[in-house]
């Protein structure tokens, strides 16, 4: 049927040019509108952008017309833009193997590409993200993502030791969530783990950051890695007092080449706990309403991790295998090698109320 459209259009166009010149222009407009409508109908669903089809209810890995999968949507991305850190946590699984950090404009270019591919949430991590240019590099990325890309959620994971109030004054309005890593409320345990700050007290600093988050209207979150040195600790009282929007509790994870093996910068084997020990910790804290547990099984394939070169890291085989950079091959091609399990992402609660505008917090 649609093969007749070009023929009919050609005949009408010929007829137009046989008319006097004054009538030509008044006749061309309706003809082109007719052709555009015909082309849209012929294209049908195929003419609609991928993001529009997803918004209509089609899943991120829906089957395409040729039987293949549609590209994965990078809804939530963790961008580890630096590997450098001022702590030496023994179980760290993203260690300082390079000192590379992308030029700011290149990083912005990649973030724009991710937004165009469907990204809604960006989480900046490291290493320690506040280490680069004393937090200025991070602050500019945060502002860019919220103000120019208008992402629903912009978050940071930090050890908190380098954050100053002036950073909140300058960039706090653009940040939705600040997650601070705190594995213990016993300062001696923090020293054993590698979170020691010399004369600074990690727990006291945590309380100061909580106050700043409230003052500058940033949602406050705590991340804890449960390991051999804190697995028997009872944190209910302290977590309840700090009242974070989420308390993310991770089981200590082994990643070959990062915290285990010949080429690793850490030896995390002595920190590892069993699944049963992790479950016992969770059971002890089951009455903490903000608790969000993540076992090794839930963690491994349910995060989209972007490294300092903007390569997706595939952790499916217990190590980090990088894709090519999205800056070189684009998001759709690079994400094919991410090993991302979208079902597990949803199962672990990866999609939640992550914009401070929607959290309705009692500041």
UniProtKB/Swiss-Prot annotation:
Keywords on record: 4Fe-4S, Acetylation, Antiviral defense, Endoplasmic reticulum, Golgi apparatus, Immunity, Innate immunity, Iron, Iron-sulfur, Isopeptide bond, Lipid droplet, Lyase, Membrane, Metal-binding, Mitochondrion, Mitochondrion inner membrane, Mitochondrion outer membrane, S-adenosyl-L-methionine, Ubl conjugation
| Chain spans, region Disordered | 46-73
In terms of one coarse class, where is the protein primarily found?
endoplasmic reticulum
- SMART domains given in the database record: Elp3
Q: For this protein, what reaction is catalysed?
A: CTP + AH2 + S-adenosyl-L-methionine = 3'-deoxy-3',4'-didehydro-CTP + 5'-deoxyadenosine + L-methionine + A + H2O + H(+)
Q: Cross-link of type Glycyl lysine isopeptide (Lys-Gly) (interchain with G-Cter in ubiquitin): positions?
A: 208
* Pfam families (alphabetical): Fer4_12, Radical_SAM
* UniProt protein name: S-adenosylmethionine-dependent nucleotide dehydratase RSAD2
* Native organism taxonomy: Eukaryota, Metazoa, Chordata, Craniata, Vertebrata
